[in-house]
């Protein structure tokens, strides 16, 4: 059974250069990395399957790379190897569709306090963030307003209109496009 893998995982882009149909996003993120002008909170918005989570992972790996090649990760340093092997302690993912309670957010907030051991940043990717309960959003707000210097949040959603305004106002918002046939050719 280990010979089989979901094609979306096998062919998922691993670099900014390999992301399809989102050049406006990837070039902006690459510029931020190269200039050292990183925000503490990002909101990636767009339909399912357009690369929001993929770009979040690529970005998280790139900003933690110890020997970056411009804005791309080297894939050779300890930080990149641990990410590629699924054992990075700096990158945390939360699926808010199934972990949307105040307690889930409090657990995440406890992790925010931990300083990264390898790499520069602790990156928290919250997928389907619009599914958080109102109480969970409110519990998260203080941390999003005043994060530690080592913490970066990347929130991803298919439904931006469900995100409370106080969260929206604290994020750099990136709107992902639908991928067109000509983008993939």
Mark where each language-model region is.
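P-loop/Walker A NTP-binding region and its immediately flanking N-terminal helices
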Residues: 1-173, 177-185
């Amino acid at each position: 059974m280990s010979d089989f893998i979901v094609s979306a995982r096998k062919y998922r882009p691993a670099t900014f250069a390999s992301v399809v149909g989102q050049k406006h996003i990837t070039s902006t993120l690459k510029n931020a990395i190269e200039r050292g002008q990183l925000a503490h909170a990002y909101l990636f918005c767009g339909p399912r399957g357009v690369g929001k989570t993929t770009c979040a992972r690529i970005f998280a790996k790139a900003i933690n790379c110890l020997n970056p090649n411009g804005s791309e990760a080297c894939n050779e340093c300890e930080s990149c190897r641990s990410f590629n092997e699924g054992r990075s302690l700096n990158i945390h993912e939360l699926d808010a569709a199934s972990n949307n309670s105040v307690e889930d957010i409090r657990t995440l907030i406890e992790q925010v306090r931990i300083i990264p051991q390898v790499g520069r940043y602790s990156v928290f990717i919250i997928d389907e963030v619009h599914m958080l309960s109102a109480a969970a959003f409110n519990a998260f707000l203080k941390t999003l307003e005043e994060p530690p210097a080592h913490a970066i949040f990347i929130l991803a959603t298919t439904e931006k209109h469900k995100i409370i305004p106080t969260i929206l106002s604290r994020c750099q918002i990136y709107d992902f496009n639908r991928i067109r046939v000509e983008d993939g050719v």
